[in-house]
Amino acid sequence: MVQPTLSTPPGRIQSVNLGSVRRLPVGDRTVMSAHGKRSVGGPVAVGPLGLTGDEQADLTVHGGLSKAVYAYPAEHYPFWERARREAGADVGLLDTSLPSGALGENLTVEGLLESELWVGDRLLLPGCELVVSEPRQPCYKFVAVMGFARAAKVMAESGFCGFYLRVARPGTLEAGQAFTLRPGPREVRVDQAFRLKMARRDV
């Protein structure tokens, strides 16, 4: 069997983002959410269940070994800013110019797109190793934070979902670090897995 070879470093961590659980207005009610994370500087410890200092409100759908870290491509931010502007989004928790972490991600990354990334690919960083596990699916809290009703539909149609990572080797990571991608089995791309998941549910 031929061993996968290392690619050239495809990108870097633009921002590391942590969030605390807080109240989020959703229509006429309030729910708890850690969405809308904030960028932090310096090394951050990462263990099997995620980044030290980060919280999740609903552990039935967030967190766990296979969803320890959520990453989102920085390349999609202009798309979401335009989508919110065209939809006349309620600014709510977010500014017109979206800050890193606005999509709920722990890692805002450069150089990794869902259409070019496969489930099982490995991100090799100086202080840890992460494995692509599955795409993220939008929920009603994402819609509330983004400020317009079609936000989940827009994510489904665009395929700009981001991806979860499990922690293969705990350690530390920080903004500005480059990473190397080690190919996995290359059976299912992240965008393909996302379409399959969304086809099984109503958006």
What does each of the following model-derived ranges do?
Residues 104, 161-164, 176, 190:
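Hydrophobic, well-ordered secondary-structure segments
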Residues 146-167:
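A conserved acidic, glycine/proline-rich C-terminal tail/linker
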Residues 179-181:
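Short, hydrophobic/aromatic-enriched beta-strand segments in well-ordered soluble domains
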Residues 1-125, 129-141, 150, 183-202:
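Electropositive, beta-rich accessory/interaction domains or terminal extensions
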Residues 120, 170, 174-177:
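Loop/turn positions that initiate beta-strands
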Residues 110-113, 166-170:
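A structural micro-motif recognizing beta-strand termini
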